[in-house]
Amino acid sequence: MAAACRSVKGLVAVITGGASGLGLATAERLVGQGASAVLLDLPNSGGEAQAKKLGNNCVFAPADVTSEKDVQTALALAKGKFGRVDVAVNCAGIAVASKTYNLKKGQTHTLEDFQRVLDVNLMGTFNVIRLVAGEMGQNEPDQGGQRGVIINTASVAAFEGQVGQAAYSASKGGIVGMTLPIARDLAPIGIRVMTIAPGLFGTPLLTSLPEKVCNFLASQVPFPSRLGDPAEYAHLVQAIIENPFLNGEVIRLDGAIRMQP
C-alpha cells in the first residue's frame, strides 16, 4: 500500500534566506498552511520584522549560513521554540557578475569574489544540511519512517551558465551534484533530500532592474512567458514535503527556458 502524503500542518521548517524572495514566500506559504517557520537570515536582513508579520508561528534567527556557530544557534532556537526541526529549505545565496578574463578592461575574475560565492551558496548550503541532519536524526520517525526533509535551491545556471556566471554556476552546479549522494547518505535515517533549480523569478534581485530589462527577461521564457512568482517556488516546496517518494532529485522550475550565452 502506498504511504499517505504528509501534510505540512504542524511541521517545523527552518528557511535560510527567509527574510526575502523565495525564502520569504516559502515561509508565508508554510505558515499559512499551519506549519511553524524559523527565518534564518543575516542580522540586517529585516527578518525580524517579517517574522512578526507572520505571527506567533514564526521567529527570526539572525545567522550567516557559512558559520557553524550561527547555524547551531539558529537550530537551537528552533528547537527551543518549537520542539524540533522537520524541514529545512536552503534559499540563501549571492551572485557576482564577472568574466573569467575581461580583455577590454584587462581584468581577471578575482579569487576573492569566486571564493565568496562558493562559500555562501555551496559551503553554506552544505553547512546547514549537515547540521540540520543531526537535529532531524533525533526526531521520532513517522509511520513511513521519515524523520525530515531537506530542500536546496540550485539554479538553471547550474546547467546553462551565462557569460559572467562562472562562480555562480559553479556554486549551483555543486548543489546539483551533491543532491543524490547526500540523499543516499541520509536515506538510512529517513531524511529526504531534494533540490529545486529555479529559472527567472520575480525576486528582489530581478525586480530591482529597470522595467524594460525585466520585460525582456520575461519574454525569454517559453511558457508562461513571464517571470516566475516566488509563490510558485513555495508551492513546489510544499509539494515536495508532502510527497514522500520524492528523493534525491533536482526539479527545474523554469517555464521551459534554456538560457542562452
UniProtKB/Swiss-Prot annotation:
Modified positions (N6-acetyllysine) are 53, 69, 99, 105, 212
The region annotated as signal peptide is none
Can the keyword Disulfide bond be found in this entry's annotation?
no
- Supply the alphabetized keyword list: Acetylation, Disease variant, Fatty acid metabolism, Intellectual disability, Lipid metabolism, Mitochondrion, Mitochondrion nucleoid, NAD, Neurodegeneration, Oxidoreductase, Steroid metabolism, tRNA processing
The listed locations are: Mitochondrion; Mitochondrion matrix, Mitochondrion nucleoid
Instruction: Offer one example of a GO biological process linked to this entry.
Output: androgen metabolic process
Q: Where does substrate bind?
A: 155
What is the main EC category here? Answer: oxidoreductase
Pathway(s) it belongs to: Amino-acid degradation; L-isoleucine degradation; Lipid metabolism; fatty acid beta-oxidation; Steroid metabolism; Lipid metabolism; bile acid biosynthesis
Tissue spec. comment = Ubiquitously expressed in normal tissues but is overexpressed in neurons affected in AD.
Question: Which chemical reaction does it catalyze?
Answer: a (3S)-3-hydroxyacyl-CoA + NAD(+) = a 3-oxoacyl-CoA + NADH + H(+); (2S,3S)-3-hydroxy-2-methylbutanoyl-CoA + NAD(+) = 2-methyl-3-oxobutanoyl-CoA + NADH + H(+); testosterone + NAD(+) = androst-4-ene-3,17-dione + NADH + H(+); 5alpha-androstane-3alpha,17beta-diol + NAD(+) = 17beta-hydroxy-5alpha-androstan-3-one + NADH + H(+)
Q: How is its activity regulated?
A: The phospholipase C-like activity toward cardiolipin is inhibited by amyloid-beta peptide.
The yes or no answer to whether the keyword Cell inner membrane is present is no
Q: EC?
A: 1.1.1.35, 1.1.1.62, 1.1.1.239, 1.1.1.178
**Principal place where this protein is found?**
mitochondrion
Q: Where is the active site?
A: 168
Query: Sites of the modification N-acetylalanine?
Result: 2
Q: What does this protein do?
A: Mitochondrial dehydrogenase involved in pathways of fatty acid, branched-chain amino acid and steroid metabolism. Acts as (S)-3-hydroxyacyl-CoA dehydrogenase in mitochondrial fatty acid beta-oxidation, a major degradation pathway of fatty acids. Catalyzes the third step in the beta-oxidation cycle, namely the reversible conversion of (S)-3-hydroxyacyl-CoA to 3-ketoacyl-CoA. Preferentially accepts straight medium- and short-chain acyl-CoA substrates with highest efficiency for (3S)-hydroxybutanoyl-CoA. In addition to mitochondrial dehydrogenase activity, moonlights as a component of mitochondrial ribonuclease P, a complex that cleaves tRNA molecules in their 5'-ends. Together with TRMT10C/MRPP1, forms a subcomplex of the mitochondrial ribonuclease P, named MRPP1-MRPP2 subcomplex, which displays functions that are independent of the ribonuclease P activity. The MRPP1-MRPP2 subcomplex catalyzes the formation of N(1)-methylguanine and N(1)-methyladenine at position 9 (m1G9 and m1A9, respectively) in tRNAs; HSD17B10/MRPP2 acting as a non-catalytic subunit.
Disease field reads: HSD10 mitochondrial disease: An X-linked multisystemic disorder with highly variable severity. Age at onset ranges from the neonatal period to early childhood. Features include progressive neurodegeneration, psychomotor retardation, loss of mental and motor skills, seizures, cardiomyopathy, and visual and hearing impairment. Some patients manifest lactic acidosis and metabolic acidosis.
Any idea what this protein is called? Answer: 3-hydroxyacyl-CoA dehydrogenase type-2
Question: What is the scientific name of the source organism?
Answer: Homo sapiens
